[in-house]
Structure formats: structure tokens, C-alpha cells
């Protein structure tokens, strides 16, 4: 029987008054204990995971241990952990949402042997707070009382160890109850886990950092920064309009000087501000870090400053360029932080000379983060000299107003600086990507498909699904070497003369049950991560490359959409959604499908499915396939024309296809040539996504997962408009339709690169496409700007996107709802779905950033060992696409590289080009105009560089010990580069790009073979981050994007 209590909360209002609120608090005789030793499992109603059977004790951390040592409690070796509700709520209220979410994710993770016990709702565990008792003492007392009850509840069969940092609690409770031990966390590790070296090192690091903070707080220091305002003052100021809330974004090129705050939830329509707010200098930043949600106070207009328009090195100071800034813009200072964005940071220790220069205080070291946007971090360690050549991970603990730098602690070593695996590990950590192998529990949920036990269609599924194996010609069109085929197509003529178009997608949700171990893991990963030389799958290969891959000639489960189209106008008459069984007849490559579409039938010899057919059957099947591809293309043209009429955009994205040999080694990297069949497949997928979006929204208007692409801010198009104007083009950005038409008309007859660059600039002006729950915003905000569709979602790639898995479940639920059948499984509420969407959006950004950074890593490693003065491959043609105060930005089509080329060097000399067009540095000055920049020397020579001029560029690498290496561009001639032997750029680029990846990998392998004894740290790192063993690095690689500055297509498209 429930018992009712009254819980008193004291809240402070915006006006500063204390408000007393009384809430009802109900206590239950039984709450889930999640223990296999439970004597009353039915009464406890266990739901979810249970604690492991193979433990010697249960450990219960108190609230302070959970707050300070959560990263150690995350170690998978530590099992049988019981987190009390009291401790979890303390984390939520005192450490903020980020750490609380980290704790929640730990509790959800099936790989970790830990559970949540709701002690404050259990009748025997709940203790009211006594008069005069501090919150901290009550929390410790409540947790101990719950630990005693839990021990007796398990019939005294499992010892309980409560770990706490409260010495009084250890003295008071240490020997009070037999079977319940109360000790410090340090003693717990010493006695129970003496061999867990990593945990001991991390614990020592945390303790040392805490002691340093306590010592600093006791010492008298002058304040380096103003104190942050109290939360109630910040909230009141935001509500009144005095303060502005937003996310801090630091300029990586001027990290010490410039940061910007973009308003949250504000637009030009409801705010006087039409631009970001500039935060100038570290003092005004007031201890906020890139990504923090901050509160800003605007400065008076006479104190506003302009953003820097000059090119600068990442480590330059405020006066490095000596150039005037742009027009003054809204400028402010940070007065408070609402949410910290602290995470794991990869750092490098200072050189030996720098360590020695710090003198007697050498145990406190300033380490430099790999990310330029993060300030140096002070940590306490005695390993500085030992770890000088390694990249290590640290965490920030605090940043007091009396300290110039934040304080942190050492976590672990990643790998040697410059080592390929160490650099890849750095990219993963910096993007918060965890790629540990799938666990045994997850793999046990997977179906079996072996020669001894082959997988077969079950009779039950045959009864429930529509069987298309004999009635439909189903085929796939994919890149060469593709293993995870998650979409196939079909088209046929119906008896009434109309056409039937079908899109058939792998039925992943048949194999991945909601809230199963593999479902939770896929939800955590959210996407497959593609790096330049490998990929980390969202699902195990038995699904992604086998049973969920719609391979040719085998039976597979699918979810299908089939439209009946008018035979002449292709108008959609009706649509059918449902589960099917298919057998794909052909697994075509894009190139082969295009050849068939163009009438070149000789390509049929390269299609395996035709090889064993007699001439008559071969001819008949070939005619059937050619007709199907042609009809699909005709339908796609019609669908695309309809979207074009509504303003669909075609933006610039450069893709490359990786060509593999029979041994799965890389053979070539070929830039993806635009083929009409690409558009055909894409249009069919867009059509399917659009119709599924409409269906799930109609059935679940408040909890459907859709994808929106908001219109961009008009001010972001200013550079695009000005650049187009320089070539005599007018870009109308009032709507997606006018923008699309303008870009189509901005075609220079003599230089197609101009249109590519204009489309790239349009892409950079775009806002990101995001997943959202339909219950969280108004219907008019559902629109997808880039695709010109009122509703859109992702349905067609469930093998590599968790969003598509959610959409498949929603579609199945919608179909059941139409049939008035019971909906199986619990759908996400609007609140939970919105939280999931935020997580998926975050992981998608991480995937894009890691892909871009890994590509840049390979570019740098390729050029690093080449002498730019003598190596022909370091010279290339470049196109100027932006003018700055002291240089230009250049795009190199041959390698897809964008970068800065200086026209004034650090010595103040400017570039000069003589009669032979070769450049040299001389005293002089630069004069910048809107679309050009002129360099004039003191002896009267001058050279002018215009937007979209072709110049000859030398590529070299700027090596950095603490950060990633970067490509450096130097203009060596103001004339276009003449390719030797009159080779065309697009013909030579595949060979060069192949060498880029192939040579880097080869050099790494040679270095590894030459190294007789590997460093243990590298081995540990390899085990943690390498997902596959025993095969080539390229086994999993099917396709990568050749990024310039952005992952273009993912920002706006399918």
C-alpha cells in the first residue's frame, strides 16, 4: 500500500524571494532492486538489466563519489555498482545536465554492470531530512540507510561496500552493520582492485587536482576574471532582455582574441540583432570555453569592435596582421555560464626546455590542447618529461576567477605524436566517438548465417509479408565494392496499363528489437562513422554486410513502398506501404547502369548475373533490365522537375569512390563523375523519404521523427552575392527557388570552376539540416529548404543511420494503426524523441567533423615527406575564391584543398611577380578592393589578383607538435599552372589521390615493421580503437568524401 509524505522544496524566485513549495511524495513497499538475489522478483517488478551473478560484492557510491569519480566508475571492470536515486539527483542539481546525462547513459548501457535503485520511493529506505541537518549529511545518511536495507533485502547473501569521501561517515557507519562496509574510494581501489592500474592512476590524478584546488582556494590571489552572476540574476536578466543567451563559438584562427555568441532561439524577426555577438579577448570571455551556453551583456556602441578580415596564423596575437578590422559589430562580455561544455581534451605536454623553464613548480604543467579553440590547461603530474612525445587525454575540473587557466587532471595516453593510429585516436576522442567492439551480449542477439547453419526465410514471415520474389524485377544500383546494400528498386507495368514504382529498403528492425542490447548500442553510436581509411559500423557485420544487405540472388526481408503511377503523366494514383520478401536479380554498379541507359550493351559482359545464361534468355532479360532502368530514369526526371519547380537546390559537393582490388586493398581513388543514374537513384530515395514522412506524421502528429532544413539567414549570402557580382552574375537569395535559378544561370562559359565555387559558397551559407520531433515545433517549420519539400525524413539507410530505424518502427506502427491492430513496442514520447534527435544530430556532426579531419590528416601525411621545392606533385593550379586584407583564399581542384595564400609575409614583405610571372618577396604595400587585391613594391612593380583568377600554387605542410599539421599554400606564379605532358586535371587526379592514401599507409606499415618492440601504450590504444583485425585497412571502406572545408551534401540533402 502506498504511503503519502509531504516533501518541502525551497525555491528562489527571479525577484530573490524564497518560495516554499509542498509536494506530495509517495512511498511504495516494493521498487525494482535489479538484483538476481531478490527474494521477491514478482513484487519488485524487475524491468531492464539485472546485476551480474559473478560478483563478490555490491558497491554503492555516495553522492560525492559519484560526482568526483564517475569516470572511474565507468570502467567496465568495476561491476555490481548500485547508484542510489539520492546520489543521482545530487549530480543533476550540483553538476549540471552534461554529467547527469553521462550518468544516465551509463545506467542505460548494457555493457556496464550497474543499476539505479530508487531509494527515495521505497518505504523502508526513505528518510526525511531532520531539522538543522545539512543537505550533504542527509544525502550520506540516506544512502547508507538504503545500503543496509538492500543488504538485508538480498537475505544477507551479498556483502555491500559503500564508498564515501566523508571521514565522519566512515567512522560512524564503518562497523555499524555486519556485511555493510563503509570505506573511502581510494581504499576501495587499493583493496579490491589493486591491479587496475589505469583506475589508480586516474584516481591519483583526480585527488592531486582536488588538493591543488583546495590549496589555491586557501591562498590569497588577485582575481583574473570577474565573478559570474548568480543563476537567478542571469535568468531574470534574460527574461527582461538585458542579457542574451547563446552558444560560445571561438574563432580557431584567432583563439585568444575572437569568439562569437550566436543567439539561441532568436532570429532577425524577433531581435534587433541581425548578427552574432563578438566577444573580444579572454577577459570578456570570462572563463567560458568553446561550446558553453553563456549569458552575454552587450557593451555600449562606442565600445563595439569589428571582426578581423586579415588572414592570420592560429597562434598569432592581436597585432600580428596590423590590418584594420571590419565594420564594428555588436560586442559583449560574458557575465555567466548556464551550461558548461567540458569534455575529454587531447593535449600535448610542453617540450623539455619549456618544462625546465617552469622551475620549482614543475609538477604543475600547462598542457596545450589539440583544438586551438581550447585554452591551455594546468594539470599536476610527474610524468611530463616521459610523455613529451605522446598525445594524452585530460579533463577540466574547475576554472576559478583567480586563475588565468583552467585546472584539470590527466586521464590516459593515446599514442605517439605523428603516428597514424595515435592521430586517428585523437580525432575520435576530439569528436567524442567511442568505437569499442560489439560485446558478447550484443552478438548473442544476432542471427546466425553460416555454411553449416544458413539463414532462411521463416514460414511465419512468409505468411505475414507480401512476396515479391517472382512477381517483381528488383535490382540495386550502388558504388563499386559496396557491401551494405540497403536499398533496391523495381518498376513494372500493371494490368490496367499504369506503372508501379517500388523502393525496397532492408528490414533492419526485424532483427533489431526495441531496447535490446544491440538497439541500445546502435542508438548510442547513432551512425556509421566513415574515416578516410576505415569505417566503424553502427551494426555488426552479420547485419550490415549480410542479412540486412540486399545482395543479388538471395532472399531478404524488406520494407517496401510501391506507388501506382499514371502511365503518361506519372501522377501518383495510390501508394502501398508494408513488409515484403524480395530477391534482388541484379547488383549493378552506377557505371554499368549508366552504360545500359546510354545504349552501350557491351557492358553486359561485366554483369555477373548474365554470364551463365544462354543467348535467348540473356537477350530477354537484358531487354527487361534496360527497359526498367530507362523507365526509372524517366520517372526520376519527372519527379526532379517537379521539385525544381518548387526551388530544390543543387549545391556543390565533391565525392570520390574508392576502387578496391580482389584482396580488398585500395587500387584507385576516382572522383565521382556526375552520372544521370546517380540522380535517378537519389530521386527515388527522396520520393520514398518524403512519402514516409507524410505517412508517419499523419498517424503520429506529435511524435514523428522528421528532418527539417531551415531557411538560411540572408546576411550569410553577402559573400556569395559579392563574388558572383565580380563575374557579372546576380544571385537572388530571397527564396530557394530564386537561389536555385540564379545558380543555374551563373555559368561561366570558359571556366566551370566558377559555378562550383559559387555553389560551395551557397552551401557554406546554409543552416544545417536537423532531425526533430513533430510535437516540438509548428508545422510551418517542418519544411526542407534544400529539397523544397514540406515534409521529409530519413527512411532509406537503416543499416547506417539510427534515425531510419526509428522511422521504420514508426511506419510499422502507422500500418498497424491503419489496420486497427495492436501497436507492438512502445513508441518514443515527444519529449524522449526530441532528446534522441538532439543526440543523433550531435553524433552526425561528430561524424562529419571526424571524416573531414581524417581526410585532412591523410592529405598532410601525403605531402609531409615531399620536398615542395623539387617535388612536381607539390605544384598545382589554384583558383582564388576570397579576398582578404593580407592575402587570398585558394581552392585547388586537383586535391580538393582550400587554404590561405599570403600576399604579405611576417617580415612585412609583399609578393611581386616579374615579367616571367614568378613570384618573390619585396618591400611594399597591399591595397584591397572589393573583388581584387593589388600588391605594389617600393620600386614601382605591381600585380593584381582578382576573384576567380587561376594561379600556380606550391603546397607544403606546416608541422605542429601540439596541433594537427596543416597544408600551407604559396603562390609562385600569377598565371595558371600548366600541367606537364598536357595532362588534364581530372585525368591525373585519380592517380594522385590514390597515391595520397596508398603511400601514407605504406609508409606507416614500413615503420611498424621496422619497429621491433612496440610501445605498450600504442598496443593498448590499438586494441581500444581498431574495430577489425587481420584484414586490410580498406576492407570496410566503400566510399569517402573528398572534403574541402565542409561535408556539403549532408548539410542540406538526403
From Swiss-Prot:
Residues 236-309 form the CSD1 domain. Its EC number is 3.1.13.1. GO terms for cellular component: cytoplasmic exosome (RNase complex). It holds the Pfam family Rrp44_CSD1. One of its GO terms (biological process) is mRNA catabolic process. Component of the RNA exosome complex. The catalytically inactive RNA exosome core (Exo-9) complex is believed to associate with catalytic subunits EXOSC10, and DIS3 or DIS3L in cytoplasmic- and nuclear-specific RNA exosome complex forms. PANTHER family: DIS3-LIKE EXONUCLEASE 1, RIBONUCLEASE. This is DIS3-like exonuclease 1. It comes from Pongo abelii.
